[in-house]
């Protein structure tokens, strides 16, 4: 008997139908539970993809130091992958990210470099690149690395097509690095060009962990605008309220970006009929307990 390793359990996450939260009109709303991945988020997929493909090309080897700018989930997933495969991991992130995220990264053995929250992810990316230029490590660069969306082209997209028996009509995803929506869109559009791909962005002035609207100079290089059919904005208040509703009404303990995406999915469901709408639930709510989104 051959026993499996942790890498084998990244992906193949459940797809569940919402039972109590719905917009009627004969629509089916489905949640892809990416929090069921080993390190707890959708970012397990690209993290493992980037590390293992870089190894296969001879770009990195166990014992090397990896550096990455992150707002949370990619950092956690890379810290897990580094622990599994024998790398030192340095993560650069804004200091205002939740304490749960920081503790989880450190639990996996990662070193954290915190930057002022006023500088945001833009400053984190700049500092990571400066550290690389100083010879302190290798950046896998989730924002420009094609192995990020490939993980979803080869994993998330085929899973959704199979799990819906090809009936999916809408795919809704929050947008951060954009790897999830880029890779999944590419696969689904190859199967059925009529599938509507919907990207969620924060409203002006809203701060939602995991959802970004990047300045043009920092727009991820993996992002291809034509792969998204609709851009929908969501407020912080609506994202947080839907996050609480998912827990209380569906038993889905999700993060705030997942609440934002599901709010948009419900908005779409109120506008269409006989649709099969899939929304990505990026991670779990236990990473946000200190943020106040859930009642104490």
Where are the regions a protein language model picked out?
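PLP-dependent amino-acid enzyme catalytic core
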Residues: 1-296
